[in-house]
Structure formats: structure tokens, C-alpha cells
Swiss-Prot record:
Gene source species: Xenopus tropicalis (Western clawed frog)
Source species taxonomy: Eukaryota, Metazoa, Chordata, Craniata, Vertebrata
Protein name per Swiss-Prot or TrEMBL: Betaine--homocysteine S-methyltransferase 1
PROSITE patterns: HCY (PS50970)
GO cellular component: cytoplasm
Domain of life (superkingdom): Eukaryota
Length: 403
């Protein structure tokens, strides 16, 4: 059982060397359940289907998560009206952000969890809007987070450290702790800034916790955080480390991560990591000195539970979800079939290389790698829906780049 009593804050926990377990992926999980639209990936489900969002929060809490991130990924006003999205006009960004905060707080109060208000990269930045304009967008979300009194703030899912720094500077105005994660790999951000330099810039901007999230698999994210740590040490700048990777294997992706893979987003299932992969990830992250350990897209509650179970010796307790889960498959000793009972042991699962079950499935893919980033014509955003001619042009370009 988790400790009882008054909740300690994020920095109080991290400064004491405690492990803070983040939650998992919401947009992918809720898209598969029928509550989020793939493409815009916006979080209007917080208003339209609050029971679905609430239930997913509860499952992550039961699995051992110490943090309930508000379901505010891509909840900036410009994203909610981008390319024909109806949310900004019919619901409003303020209502989405407020509802997400209320749901996260309700569930966090059911356990030893903190509420984190989150912002992410914006269409405005990709369209080369000014620093003042982009910061104004973040500030609208921050106003809601302050009103709802979240426990700390996260700037997550940024491909460019420049925009992430702008977000951190705005979030620091609240006086609350700020964490910041980039969706980058070992090659650095899309402007070529190294992971080490990215970490230093984020920390100097005011982030108390820095790291990575999304776009890459667990072990790639650990490699990136290692470079961040080295950069911080070299610059003599202090910050806690965090990592919230994908739950997909991505050894073949390029600099932009899994969104470059041909399977994104509807055919990623063969790449899903096992719970045993997550045991290894949690241990590697802990040994590196990372103390905020969670997940992003593809991370389901059973992945979060694997983190909590792997680090139970350090934390001193198991999550409630472990009541129905035997350690390293030990519950299989109750199975009716003897060959399945024989799998009730750690070394079996650690040594197993899972098969895909697809005879003609390649082990690797060729990333699309269009190489576009901020300022490119194809990334300039618009309020109007994508036109048929724009799609025809993109289809033609895809054919050329695939040959």
C-alpha cells in the first residue's frame, strides 16, 4: 500500500530520492476506445466523454501512478481550431482545460497522486508566429491551471527546445514547480540542438525536472536522457531527470521518431513492448538516476504497473493493481495446463523473444523522413479544413518520396 497522510509535493519527493511514477498514454488509449479522433488528437473527450477519461485515470492510479496529468495534450486554442477542428468554436479551450483539471483532481484525491497541468507544442510555433503570440497561447492554459490549483506543471512533447523554453518561462510565472520534456532522440531537437544543450536551456529557463517523452522507445529515451544528464553535469546545472517514452519498439525510426514510421498511427501493434520490457526500462532508468519514470503513447496501465512492481523494493510497497498480478508470472502456477504452469518463472519471460505471428512481417521499416520542420510550407497551419487539392498534392509527394 502507498503511504498515508498529507501528500508531499513533487520536488519534496524527488529531493528525497523517491521514485515518482508518471501515468501513461491518453490520446492513443482513448482513440482505440473510440473517444479521441486520430489526426487532430485533441482532448475534447474531457468534456464530451468525461467518464472515459476518468476511468483511464483510475486505471493508471491503481497501477501505481503518482501523477495524474490533466488530459490537456494539444488543448491550446490554436490547436483546437486547426484544420477544421470544431472544438474551439463549439466547446472552447477553457472548458476543455477546466474539465480535464477537475477530472484529474477527482481521481488524484482517491490516492497518493499529484495533479500536473500540461501544455504541449503549438501549431502557431510551427507557423513561425512570434514569441509573444506563442507565449500568449500557453498563458491561457496556465490561467486555468492556476484557477484549478494543480500541484505542478509540465511542458511536454516539444520538438524544438526554443518553444519548450518559452513554455517553461510562462509556466514559471505560476510559482509552481515545472517539469519539461522534449520528444527528441539522441540526435537532438529538430534544429540540431544536442540533448545536453537542450537540458541545460530548459533548466536555466526554470525547469526543475527535465527529460524526454514520446516519439521514441524506452531504451532510446534512456540513451537520450543519459546525454542530457552529461550536459547538465558539464554545465554544472542541477535538475531532476524524467522519462516518459513510447510503449513501442522504434529502433528503425529517424530523427522525428515514430511519426516517420509507415505504421504510424494505425498499424503499430506489432511493435508494442511487453511488460517485461518495461521492467528492464524501469531498472535502467533508475540506475541512471532518473526518479520521475512514466510513459506516453502506447503505455497502458499494465505497463505502468510493471514500473511500480520493478521498483517496489525501492518504494517499499506494491500498487493496488498487483493484487491481481503474480510477480513475474507467478500466477500461472494456477493454470490448468502444465506447459503454461511451467512458465511461472522470471527467467522464462526475461529470455523469451516474442514472435509477431506474422509470417511476412518485416522486422524493420523504412521511415518516411520528409525532413520538414518549423517554417516549411507543408507545416504552415490553417483554421480551414485541409482541402482535397492539398491532399492530392501530399499523396503525389508521398509517392515520389517512397520511390
Amino acid at each position: 500500500m502507498a503511504p498515508t497522510g498529507a501528500k508531499k509535493g513533487l520536488l519534496e519527493r524527488l529531493d528525497a530520492g523517491e521514485v515518482v511514477i508518471g501515468d501513461g498514454g491518453f490520446v492513443f488509449a482513448l482513440e482505440k476506445r473510440g473517444y479521441v479522433k486520430a489526426g487532430p488528437w485533441t482532448p475534447e473527450a474531457a468534456v464530451e466523454h468525461p467518464e472515459a477519461v476518468r476511468q483511464l485515470h483510475r486505471e493508471f492510479l491503481r497501477a501505481g501512478a503518482n501523477v495524474m496529468q490533466t488530459f490537456t495534450f494539444y488543448a491550446s486554442d490554436d490547436k483546437l481550431e486547426n484544420r477544421g477542428n470544431y472544438v474551439a468554436k463549439k466547446i472552447s479551450g477553457q472548458k476543455v482545460n477546466e474539465a480535464a483539471c477537475d477530472i484529474a483532481r477527482e481521481v488524484a484525491n482517491e490516492g497518493d497522486a499529484l495533479v500536473a497541468g500540461g501544455v504541449s507544442q503549438t501549431p502557431s510555433y510551427l507557423s513561425c508566429k512570434s514569441e509573444v503570440e506563442v507565449k500568449g497561447i500557453f498563458r491561457k492554459q496556465l490561467d486555468v491551471f492556476i484557477k484549478k490549483n494543480v500541484d505542478f506543471l509540465i511542458a511536454e512533447y516539444f520538438e524544438h527546445v526554443e518553444e519548450a523554453v518559452w513554455a517553461v518561462e510562462v509556466l514559471k510565472e505560476s510559482g509552481k514547480p515545472v517539469a519539461a520534456t522534449l520528444c527528441i532522440g539522441p540526435q537532438g531537437d529538430l534544429n540540431g540542438v544536442t540533448p545536453g544543450e537542450c537540458a541545460v536551456r530548459l533548466a536555466k529557463a526554470g525547469a526543475s525536472v527535465v527529460g524526454v517523452n514520446c516519439h521514441f522507445d524506452p531504451m532510446t529515451c534512456i540513451a537520450t536522457v543519459k546525454l542530457m544528464k552529461e550536459g547538465l553535469v558539464a554545465a554544472k546545472v542541477k535538475a531532476h531527470l524524467m522519462t516518459q517514452p513510447l510503449a513501442y519498439h522504434t529502433p528503425d525510426c529517424g530523427k522525428q521518431g515514430f511519426i516517420d514510421l509507415p505504421e504510424f498511427p494505425f498499424a503499430l501493434e506489432p511493435r508494442i513492448v511487453t511488460r517485461w520490457d518495461i521492467h528492464k526500462y524501469a531498472r535502467e532508468a533508475y540506475n541512471l538516476g532518473v526518479r520521475y519514470i512514466g510513459g506516453c503513447c502506447g503505455f497502458e496501465p499494465y505497463h505502468t504497473r510493471a514500473i511500480a512492481e520493478e521498483l517496489a523494493p525501492e518504494r517499499g510497497f506494491l500498487p493496488p493493481g498487483s493484487e491481481k498480478h503474480g510477480s513475474w508470472g507467478s500466477g500461472l502456477e494456477m493454470h490448468t495446463k502444465p506447459w503454461v504452469r511451467a512458465r511461472a518463472r522470471r527467467d522464462y519471460w526475461e529470455k523469451l523473444p516474442p514472435a509477431s505471428g506474422r509470417p511476412c512481417c518485416p522486422s524493420m521499416s523504412k521511415p518516411d523522413a520528409w525532413g520538414v520542420t518549423k517554417g516549411d510550407a507543408d507545416l504552415m497551419q490553417q483554421k480551414e479544413a485541409t482541402t482535397e487539392q492539398q491532399l492530392i498534392d501530399l499523396f503525389a509527394k508521398q509517392c515520389i518520396k517512397s520511390n
